[in-house]
Amino acid sequence: KEELYWFAGLVNGDASVCTGNVTQNTAACAKLTASITVNTGVLDASGNLAGDVSGFSSWTSIGNNYNNRYSGTFDGNGYTISGLYFNSSNTYNVGLFGYISGGTIKNVGIVDSYFNGREDVGGLCGNNQGTISDCYFFGSVSGNNFVGGLCGEMCNGSLSSCYFVGTVSGSSNTGAVCGYIDRATITNCFFNSDIFSGVA
């Protein structure tokens, strides 16, 4: 858990998380060597957010805005990250990754996780302008605009061999795989989800 937060701090330039004499690196690379549990029981048996979230550690997306957009390679190596939780209805670029530009995300599963933001919200990535492959997300995603089970928005990016199981809700541009795409490619992706669009 600590290493994952440290990596997010490294990419985002957050000295409060990434302590020591470290320079921000938005092109940093990482490869998981084990599964990671951040929180336990984020979602109940019905897939809804747990009743008591007071003890949860909040997640900050890797590449959490345009200035910190991620361009490295993140290889999950077949492992899972469990229990990511973020709940702020005024935040953009929300997901495991917030904003990817030229980066590569592969071979990782995100389970028992909840993301709620304002715009560009996705289980894997809020705004994908890179390459995502062989990943999955089991959880709940919600927001106002550009909301997707895997990616909230995807322009000039690609998504392949990925799947989503869970619930996604948004007011507009909402989809099970991706909320909005432009000059992007989606191949061999599927979902099993409830979709609620046109709601707050």
Task: Give the residues covered by each predicted segment.
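Surface-exposed repetitive/solenoidal architectures
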Residues: 1-200
